[in-house]
């Protein structure tokens, strides 16, 4: 956004969430202190900023009394942990379905659409992860994650409480 590569498609009908405000957007939702609005508001633009753990929490809180979002309440806990940086290493390395969904969404446009349509239809995350194409993507991502964990373990040294992972000799 800052580089201007999307300027021609951002207009007053564009909503931007969890990214720096764009002068052309109509709705900006953010929680980062660095993006807190002050006097420099944008004319004809709605800016929703709150000091919440995640930008998604702002949207969730705004809509939860207007539409039933109860099926997302558990997911929001994990979204807050991830976006707010309050997730522990053990939680991050764990097998929580929300985390695995987050790791596979966006890998392909087709699977992303399938995931979003199923969430919209209130299909549980566990059921979504069992869909054949999603399950295949998940298996590949789990194997990749194990490879990354093993590579880090094998190349990690701690010197004066500083963790150093040497990756320059990897093939």
Predicted regions and their residues:
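Hydrophobic helix-and-loop "lid/oligomerization" segment in the mid-to-C-terminal part
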Residues: 1, 84-171
């Amino acid at each position: 956004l800052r580089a201007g590569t999307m300027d021609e498609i951002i207009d007053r009908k564009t909503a931007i969430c969890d990214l720096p405000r764009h002068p052309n957007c109509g709705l900006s939702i953010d929680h980062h202190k660095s993006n807190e609005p002050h006097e420099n508001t944008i004319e004809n633009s709605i800016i929703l900023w709150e000091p919440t753990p995640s930008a998604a929490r702002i949207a969730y809180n705004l809509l939860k009394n207007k539409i039933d979002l109860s099926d997302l309440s558990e997911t929001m806990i994990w979204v807050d942990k991830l976006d707010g940086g309050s997730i522990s290493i053990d939680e991050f390395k764990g097998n929580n379905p929300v985390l695995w969904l987050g790791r596979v969404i966006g890998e392909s446009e087709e699977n992303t659409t399938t995931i979003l349509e199923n969430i919209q239809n209130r299909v549980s995350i566990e059921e979504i992860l069992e869909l054949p194409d999603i399950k295949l993507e998940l298996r590949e991502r789990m194997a990749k994650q194990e490879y990354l964990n093993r590579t880090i373990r094998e190349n990690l040294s701690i010197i004066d409480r500083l963790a150093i992972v040497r990756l320059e000799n990897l093939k």
